Amino acid sequence: MRGCQKKFDERVPILRKCIFIHGAPNTGKTYATERALAGRKTLHVGGGGTGKFDSLKPSHDAIIVDDDVCPNLLNMSDNYSCKAYRRGRNNPIWAGEWLIVTSNLPFREWLFKCGFSYKEEDSHVKAMFSRFFVCKVVGDDSSAELYLLNPSTRGLVEEQKQRMRDFLQFQKVFNDTIQNYHAEKSRNDFDAFAFVTNHCPFGDFPERQKKAFASLYDNGS
């Protein structure tokens, strides 16, 4: 803790990697993110509400914000140790290198949810685009991959190069994982309607239950 406090007090630079991943629900983006961060102590937050970072510890090297907003985003995405909240007490210091956001929303809409302006010329919005690798999960179940839409441009050239190298390694593991995820998912797909009709024909059901079951699976819903 004292080392973390010293970094905060002396504003020691950190090569922080901020990655935003936009994708539809159930595409495996959070699972692939966790695998790409394997070996790093990671705090996983989501579900709305306050106190998201109350469990944050100095030993956390990564944070995954899963379909949720991120408080104090300007500081959390900066290249220095920071405090998680804007309050005085019970405010944990974070000196980790990875801030990953997974969302069903595009980046600009997510920023708006976090309290930023929707105007492109807003200085804080520009700062976010310079700090984040903005990505999207593209393709179908058989060929999903993480596609880079906007690279991070923050810092000196050598910092940008190292940050890009780190991102590319993250992207490689992410893509390997998400493709395996979809392959495994397709092998485990279960058609409940087909199973029941094959093993327990509708003739064995009372009429009312037969109608209810048929409507439940009507049109693939």
Segments (PLM) and residue ranges:
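Generic beta-sheet signal
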Residues: 17-21, 61-65, 97-99
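Glycine-rich phosphate-binding P-loop
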Residues: 16-38
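SF2 helicase motor core recognition
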Residues: 28-30, 51-55, 110
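A generic local structural motif
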Residues: 5-8, 48-53, 85-89, 120-122
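Short, conserved, surface-exposed binding loops centered on an aromatic residue
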Residues: 9-13, 36, 53-57, 91-93
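AAA+/P-loop NTPase substrate/partner-engagement loops
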Residues: 39-72
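N-terminal pre-Walker A segment at the start of P-loop NTPase domains
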Residues: 1-15
